[in-house]
């Protein structure tokens, strides 16, 4: 429970001028050798009605003086206890240190606030469970190189490796450089791994400096393969500045390297090096095929095509194979706009296994007439697509029937034509045709040698007690003229019953 005095001390923001020094002291708002203390907002204090300083700076000063009473007042005003501990460490007031430290039990959050190496060490010693390795790790994180220099001989090989990696990840360039130049590190090459992980070209540059200027161990055995690997990594990540930094020390941007840029669609990397390298036609073609397989953007595909002058004769079949295998149409659209039409060859493959929704989008994207889609669906035995595309053209079954009949006349594919006729007959079954329309449909079947459908519609007409003798005679003439033996036999059989 707070006393009334503490509540007043915590919340008072204004001291009347008429208050005497004695009253201020009795209120606990007096700082010996400094004067009265007054809270200004949440972050500042006013000393002796004259000097305004941050509350945490006042805490550090009070801690350095060992003034527990002022420290407690400032903590009441929501100052940061860490600054009080720092001040107490600077003034070697260990009883105050212990009193304050017991409230937090962890020194590591204080360390980033400390600038002085000696105070840094003393603060870390407050945690009796920590060792030298822990001290050095935190020193590295907080740019205390001098502490690392002091304790380097007391670190094991594993500790040194951990400290080096910490310096790299914390991007403490001076410490990374000093360690690379002065301490034997088990795996110094980790600097490159971390540089790529953080995408930090400064670390990469330091790694190369250590490798080439100081010949640090374990890194100079196969420099060519190391540089090649770095170029591939950088190309795959789109890090052009990494590639340029690496090339200062050697290496070459090969097709393997450019393939990584293509695979991950890094057009700027590609553009930069394609402008500066004279690649063979075959290499450019391979990069284009890889870009298709990787589903690269239009800009990347256009870039590669531009270096091929949009000439794809040598790889036409391979492009179609890639489009089919990876179900991508971007390249087809780009070439189509350049008057290079690959739609026909790929349409049959796509319509053979893709859904109606997909094919509708494909049709709209490339402005394909529904008639072509229906005929191709018939060739590929996709009755479901025939029904859906024709329904999209005409909603009414009768209209669809007449529309499909018109397509049969121009359909050359035998099995496709048969499927269209089969679909037409199913539509007929769902319609209510007048006898005249049924006669016309029977003649249509006769013209196209659709024996089964012809027999079916004649049977339907007979059930309606409609005389079909003249129809059979007319259709017989058609069958004889077109030389349809099976249809001739069927008609003659039907005529025998009339």
Swiss-Prot record:
A family per Pfam: DUF249
Keywords from UniProt, A to Z, are: Early protein
Kindly summarize what the UniProt induction comment says about this protein's expression.
Expressed in the early phase of the viral replicative cycle.
Indicate the family of this protein: Belongs to the asfivirus MGF 505 family.
What biological function has been recorded for the protein in this entry? Plays a role in virus cell tropism, and may be required for efficient virus replication in macrophages.
Q: What is this protein called?
A: Protein MGF 505-5R
